[in-house]
């Protein structure tokens, strides 16, 4: 475990997992596209709401995770994924400039297209190790989530697309947990 301003991220098999709500473990461990899983689970069809899609400076922790030197900008994308009425997932993606070269150019302006749909469609994508966290009230990541993300579980991993890695962080929101209880 390492501590930083963002969150305390643990390897996915850390003992803290014993506190993960029932049913959420399968979502945290999803090895493939979370988008595909959402498409199967969200009633009425999956909707993507774009919150942010711009160039900017990732947090120090995020920059380290994608091996971006201090002060360099990356493409930052924040979206809500869920039904028309309720968000189930808040996702934040950090895309270094190298990830947007060549075939990756289309990732720079996805709009309402889910990242998973664009990445996993007929392409070879490798996922790095998954890390999990439970967001605290002072985590800047929790503050980015509309309505607040304190107490929510999150996962993050590096997705390798060609020679460059993206950092994808996904926060599991209360409506998803409610759907698991139904």
Curated annotation (Swiss-Prot):
It catalyses: chorismate = 4-hydroxybenzoate + pyruvate. Removes the pyruvyl group from chorismate, with concomitant aromatization of the ring, to provide 4-hydroxybenzoate (4HB) for the ubiquinone pathway. Belongs to the UbiC family. The gene is ubiC. It is an enzyme of class 4 (lyase). Pathway: Cofactor biosynthesis; ubiquinone biosynthesis. GO terms for cellular component: cytosol. GO terms for molecular function: chorismate lyase activity. GO terms for biological process: pyruvate biosynthetic process; ubiquinone biosynthetic process. Its main location: cytoplasm. Transmembrane segments: none annotated. It is found in: Cytoplasm. InterPro entries: Chorismate--pyruvate_lyase (IPR007440), Chorismate_lyase_/UTRA_dom_sf (IPR028978). Keywords: Cytoplasm, Lyase, Pyruvate, Ubiquinone biosynthesis. Substrate binds at residues 77, 115, 170. It comes from the Bacteria. This is Probable chorismate pyruvate-lyase. Its EC number is 4.1.3.40.
